[in-house]
Structures are given as structure tokens and as C-alpha cells.
């Protein structure tokens, strides 16, 4: 990819807003080094200028004739092209107070830099050929990953594995297209061309590889996005107590008054490396209260959309008609029964409750005493992964799971190849077949950014935070 060094210099705070030990101001562009030199006073005797990629200690001043010191900093200059963006880059490590960072950034901007747009540093890295588009997207996904396994998934794409695989598929189709063009343009010459059987084999083999990538998207979804787990059950079964126990803090109001939870509460946690969105819902019961009726209706809707339902049952009372109705309406493997309040149940009550489940998966806990939480977490993880036919975390990283945009493009490419295979069988002329091959190659190029339209690039990079 050709170089597209920016003609201007951009700057932004590269660390999260708020108080912290260290905050970083990042600059990229042709004036980065000059701006740093204008604002920096070294504390090292005999300082003669910035050595590339070496941290230097000193003071940043405000750029006025008075040279008022703004902060005590560590600064580094990284010359192009071996930088993240492919341009001259400067990073100023300040103390992490918002007022300090704002003052230093203001001084930088007054020296001629402009504020960076969302994702502009990574966009410049892409435009300057430092990474392909799949790697650029992986940067944002690593930052947004809800758990460690999601980071691993994004890291595999940041390493360029997916982009290289897509390019290999596209290059194979390009080779086939070239051979078709030769056959069309020089029909009377004795040139080596693909036999129809070889042509079909190349198309089908590439289509199979694309199908696998598409399947990997859904099978890696729980690692990338996390799972939605809904807590449902009768009023006073202990759903809110269970939510609090899983979170390790009091989030939901717990009382003996039926119908305390009318709306739903949502919190995120990590269970055995799996990011989970826990949703506590209104208790299932018949009620004349209009607000509570809406809460019960919403509970059923949320349960139907969940990756897993934790059906919380008072182990002293067992399952009633509402619980039985919910279990009957749900798909097999989508409900884990949580037998709660085991600290207050007799052995006979607990045995009777287990028998009523007719072999359905269940875990016995006491939310009030915090007992059984580890077993519950393990069961949730196992059932979510089994139900979604999820790749293992290792396989999700090594098998190159694409994101949604990439998967949609892969589906379009696959449609072209499947139509092409049908054309081959029906004897469509090679020149028409070449049009479909060209279309499939073009779509694959969009994935890596070789031919991606500007509106798609804008959508991708606008989703980044400023400073990245």
C-alpha cells in the first residue's frame, strides 16, 4: 500500500479520562518533533536533542515567553517510518490529572497541531500501510473486549493472521480469473488453461474456506461479545439475592415483599474467563398491578432472547406452574435450574424438588450464604459454550474468527462463488464466469482494506476512541 503521510500534525490524550498516575499526550505528523522541542526543557546536563526512541526527563512549559512550567514529564520522539502510524510520533508522559493533561494538550495545539479525530492515529497507520483493515479493527476490539478471551481473539487478528488468509484466498481466485481471461482472449492459441473440473475444484475449495470463516464468527460470538444470562423465576425465589451473590456486592434490593423487582437490572461480570451480562427480572406470577404485569411480560421476552436462563427455584417449594411453563417453552439446554435457599430446605424437600425437574440440569446454592457459587459459575460457562457450539478459546484465536463487518463481506463473496459454481454446471461461458470471480475478489479486498469505500472506513474509525 502506498504511503499517505498526513500533511498536518494531530494530537490527543491517549489515556482514559479521569485521575491517574500517568497520562499520555500523543502526537503524529511532520511537526511532532518540532512541537516537542519547542515546549520541552531537559533536566539532563548537556542535553543536545532527542535521541530516537529514548525517554527523556524534563519539563513541559506553556510555550509563552514566560515559559511557565506545566508539568514534570518523560517524553519520547519516534521518527518515521517505524512507528505505529508510520509518521513522526511523540508521546509526552505527564501526571494523570485532567487539568494537567488539558493544559499540556492546549500548549501542543497552540504550537500548530490540531485535535485528532476518533481513531485517526489508527486510520493513519492503515493508510500508511502499517496494518491492514482487519488489524485496525482488531485494535478497537482489543480495547473493547469484555474479558481476557476476547482480547486473545482480537490479538490473533492484530497479528495479521486473518488478513493474510483472506489475501491468500483472493489471490487464488485472481489466478483462476487470469487463466479464464487468457482462455477468452486467446481462444485459438495453445495456452495452458484450467480444465472445467479444475476450475470447479478451485471455486469449491475457496468457498469451503469462506464457509468455515463464516461459521467461526457465530461460534466465537460468546468470546467476543459475552453471553446474556437471564435470572427468572417466581417472586421471592431469591433472584435478586443470587444476583448480589454473583456480583459480590449489593446491587438489587432484597426484601420479603413479593414483586419488589418490577423492572430488570443488568450487570456485567466475568465467570471463568467468559464475559456475562446478568439480567435480573421481575418475578413470574399473576398480578393485577399494571406495572408489574409489564415487568413479567418483559421477563418472558428477555428469557426467550437469552443465551442461558437461570431459573431460580425456592428449593423448599419446588417448581410451580409458572416455572414448568417457562421450561416447556424454552429450547433444550437453554435453562439451568438454580435450586436456591438450600440452607433452609430439608433433605426431603430438596430431593422432591430435584425429582420434579425430570433430569433437567440444575445446581444447588444458597445465595444468602454464598454457597455453590463456584459450581454455578462453572455450569453457566459450560452450558453457554455448549449451546452456542462455541469454539474453544484456543481454537477461536487460531481459527481466525472474523467480526460482523468481515462476516457480511464473506457472505457476499460466498454468494458470488455459489452462483459461479451453478454457472459452471450449466455451461455458462468463461467470460461471464469471470465477472463473478472479479466481484468475489473485489469483496474480499474490502475486508483487508485494499478497495474499501470511504464511507465504510469512516464508520469503522468513527467507532474508535479519540487518542487511538
From Swiss-Prot:
<feature type="binding site">
    <location>
        <position position="257"/>
    </location>
    <ligand>
        <name>K(+)</name>
    </ligand>
</feature>
<dbReference type="InterPro" id="IPR005225">
    <property type="entry name" value="Small_GTP-bd"/>
</dbReference>
<dbReference type="GO" id="GO:0003924">
    <property type="term" value="F:GTPase activity"/>
</dbReference>
<feature type="binding site">
    <location>
        <position position="236"/>
    </location>
    <ligand>
        <name>K(+)</name>
    </ligand>
</feature>
<feature type="binding site">
    <location>
        <position position="255"/>
    </location>
    <ligand>
        <name>K(+)</name>
    </ligand>
</feature>
<feature type="binding site">
    <location>
        <position position="260"/>
    </location>
    <ligand>
        <name>K(+)</name>
    </ligand>
</feature>
<dbReference type="InterPro" id="IPR006073">
    <property type="entry name" value="GTP-bd"/>
</dbReference>
<keyword id="KW-0460">Magnesium</keyword>
<keyword id="KW-0819">tRNA processing</keyword>
<dbReference type="GO" id="GO:0030488">
    <property type="term" value="P:tRNA methylation"/>
</dbReference>
<dbReference type="InterPro" id="IPR027266">
    <property type="entry name" value="TrmE/GcvT_dom1"/>
</dbReference>
<keyword id="KW-0630">Potassium</keyword>
<keyword id="KW-0963">Cytoplasm</keyword>
<comment type="similarity">
    <text>Belongs to the TRAFAC class TrmE-Era-EngA-EngB-Septin-like GTPase superfamily. TrmE GTPase family.</text>
</comment>
<comment type="subunit">
    <text>Homodimer. Heterotetramer of two MnmE and two MnmG subunits.</text>
</comment>
<keyword id="KW-0547">Nucleotide-binding</keyword>
<dbReference type="Pfam" id="PF01926">
    <property type="entry name" value="MMR_HSR1"/>
</dbReference>
<keyword id="KW-0378">Hydrolase</keyword>
<dbReference type="InterPro" id="IPR004520">
    <property type="entry name" value="GTPase_MnmE"/>
</dbReference>
<feature type="binding site">
    <location>
        <position position="261"/>
    </location>
    <ligand>
        <name>Mg(2+)</name>
    </ligand>
</feature>
<feature type="binding site">
    <location>
        <position position="240"/>
    </location>
    <ligand>
        <name>Mg(2+)</name>
    </ligand>
</feature>
<dbReference type="GO" id="GO:0046872">
    <property type="term" value="F:metal ion binding"/>
</dbReference>
<keyword id="KW-0342">GTP-binding</keyword>
<dbReference type="InterPro" id="IPR031168">
    <property type="entry name" value="G_TrmE"/>
</dbReference>
<feature type="binding site">
    <location>
        <begin position="366"/>
        <end position="368"/>
    </location>
    <ligand>
        <name>GTP</name>
    </ligand>
</feature>
<dbReference type="GO" id="GO:0005525">
    <property type="term" value="F:GTP binding"/>
</dbReference>
<dbReference type="InterPro" id="IPR027417">
    <property type="entry name" value="P-loop_NTPase"/>
</dbReference>
<dbReference type="InterPro" id="IPR018948">
    <property type="entry name" value="GTP-bd_TrmE_N"/>
</dbReference>
<dbReference type="GO" id="GO:0002098">
    <property type="term" value="P:tRNA wobble uridine modification"/>
</dbReference>
<feature type="binding site">
    <location>
        <position position="26"/>
    </location>
    <ligand>
        <name>(6S)-5-formyl-5,6,7,8-tetrahydrofolate</name>
    </ligand>
</feature>
<feature type="binding site">
    <location>
        <begin position="280"/>
        <end position="283"/>
    </location>
    <ligand>
        <name>GTP</name>
    </ligand>
</feature>
<dbReference type="InterPro" id="IPR025867">
    <property type="entry name" value="MnmE_helical"/>
</dbReference>
<feature type="domain" description="TrmE-type G">
    <location>
        <begin position="226"/>
        <end position="385"/>
    </location>
</feature>
<dbReference type="GO" id="GO:0005829">
    <property type="term" value="C:cytosol"/>
</dbReference>
<feature type="binding site">
    <location>
        <begin position="255"/>
        <end position="261"/>
    </location>
    <ligand>
        <name>GTP</name>
    </ligand>
</feature>
<keyword id="KW-0479">Metal-binding</keyword>
<feature type="binding site">
    <location>
        <position position="130"/>
    </location>
    <ligand>
        <name>(6S)-5-formyl-5,6,7,8-tetrahydrofolate</name>
    </ligand>
</feature>
<feature type="binding site">
    <location>
        <begin position="236"/>
        <end position="241"/>
    </location>
    <ligand>
        <name>GTP</name>
    </ligand>
</feature>
<dbReference type="Pfam" id="PF12631">
    <property type="entry name" value="MnmE_helical"/>
</dbReference>
<comment type="function">
    <text>Exhibits a very high intrinsic GTPase hydrolysis rate. Involved in the addition of a carboxymethylaminomethyl (cmnm) group at the wobble position (U34) of certain tRNAs, forming tRNA-cmnm(5)s(2)U34.</text>
</comment>
<feature type="binding site">
    <location>
        <position position="468"/>
    </location>
    <ligand>
        <name>(6S)-5-formyl-5,6,7,8-tetrahydrofolate</name>
    </ligand>
</feature>
<dbReference type="Pfam" id="PF10396">
    <property type="entry name" value="TrmE_N"/>
</dbReference>
